[in-house]
């Protein structure tokens, strides 16, 4: 008897980020994750891309990385500004760890159409 999934066809669903297999985050959970990025001393980086190119191309920076930024409200306002400027794009935030020179975390805040 074949397995019937109530979730859908997991093999064809594109996942954009660290939390891609979990239910969508609430606004409060997104704020908590951004606060975690800042608390770790990672640099918040905002990127965006049109959904048609999200798996084939590099994502574009929104401004420059926010090196040393400690203000959660500023990061959130820049995420919202990026989404207003590109409403049909995916918008994600990356926590860049300069010590290990790698991404500490990355997740989509807004998903495009």
Swiss-Prot record:
Function: RuBisCO catalyzes two reactions: the carboxylation of D-ribulose 1,5-bisphosphate, the primary event in carbon dioxide fixation, as well as the oxidative fragmentation of the pentose substrate in the photorespiration process. Both reactions occur simultaneously and in competition at the same active site. Although the small subunit is not catalytic it is essential for maximal activity. There are estimated to be 152 RuBisCO holoenzymes per carboxysome.
Keyword Coiled coil in annotation: no
Subcellular location: Carboxysome
Subunit structure: Heterohexadecamer of 8 large and 8 small subunits. Forms a CsoS2-CsoS1-RuBisCO complex.
Gene name tied to this protein: cbbS
Protein family according to the UniProt entry: Belongs to the RuBisCO small chain family.
Gene Ontology annotations for the cellular component aspect, listed alphabetically: carboxysome
GO MF annotations, alphabetized: ribulose-bisphosphate carboxylase activity
Keywords: Bacterial microcompartment, Calvin cycle, Carbon dioxide fixation, Carboxysome, Photorespiration, Photosynthesis
Official protein name in the record: Ribulose bisphosphate carboxylase small subunit
Gene Ontology biological process terms from the UniProt entry: photorespiration; reductive pentose-phosphate cycle
Other facts noted in the record for this chain: The basic functional RuBisCO is composed of a large chain homodimer in a 'head-to-tail' conformation. In form I RuBisCO this homodimer is arranged in a barrel-like tetramer with the small subunits forming a tetrameric 'cap' on each end of the 'barrel'.
InterPro entries in alphabetical order: RuBisCO_ssu (IPR024681), RuBisCO_ssu_dom (IPR000894), RuBisCO_ssu_sf (IPR036385)
Keyword Amino-acid biosynthesis attached: no
UniProt-listed CDD domains: RuBisCO_small (cd03527)
HAMAP family in the record: RuBisCO_S_bact
């Amino acid at each position: 008897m074949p397995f019937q999934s109530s979730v859908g066809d997991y093999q064809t669903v594109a996942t954009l980020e660290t939390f891609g297999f979990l239910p969508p985050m609430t606004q409060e959970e997104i704020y908590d994750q951004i606060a975690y990025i800042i608390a770790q001393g990672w640099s918040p980086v905002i990127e965006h891309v049109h959904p048609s190119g999200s798996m084939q191309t590099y994502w574009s920076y929104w401004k420059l990385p926010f090196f040393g930024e400690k203000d959660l409200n500023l990061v959130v306002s820049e995420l919202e500004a990026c989404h207003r400027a590109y409403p049909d794009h995916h918008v994600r935030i990356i926590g860049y760890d300069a010590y290990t020179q790698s991404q500490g975390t990355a997740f989509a805040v807004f998903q495009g159409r």
